[in-house]
């Protein structure tokens, strides 16, 4: 049973291993999708992972090896910089995930990224400021 940040580890999943861990990661990603605006369906996420358009990350319980959180990143290439965007994140307490952000950041640097970003609801945006994230934009949408 996960009780603290010492009980978990974050691991990036190689594209050729996505199918092997998918059933453990899928429920956490589906939970994250419940809070989205319908940009993706779970089958879309799997296809993006298999196509290497996104990367799968899992937070697992060190003692049981159970997946307790899952998330996806994507590399966004702009003309003047490369950014690693956290697209989805779902599972247990955000505090557990926050403790592992250096793993994401180190990997992103290795890919040539100079920034991390995520689209976040207000509550998560407040928590991310504790990790030196700055709110840059407000996203507004209208159905047409």
Regions found by a protein language model. Name each.
Residues 81-129:
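Acyl-donor binding region in acyl/amide transferases
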Residues 3, 83, 132-133, 142:
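Secondary-structure boundary/capping motif
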Residues 54, 130-134:
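Short glycine-aromatic motifs
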Residues 46-47, 74-77, 106:
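Short, flexible, glycine/charge-rich loop motifs used to bind or transfer phosphoryl groups or to couple energy/partner
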Residues 1-40:
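Short amphipathic alpha-helix that is part of the acyltransferase structural core
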Residues 119, 134-144:
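Conserved catalytic-core motifs of GNAT/GCN5-like acyltransferases
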Residues 35-56:
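Active-site rim helix/loop that mediates acceptor-substrate recognition in acyltransferases
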Residues 51-94:
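Conserved donor-binding loop and adjoining core beta-sheet/short helix segment
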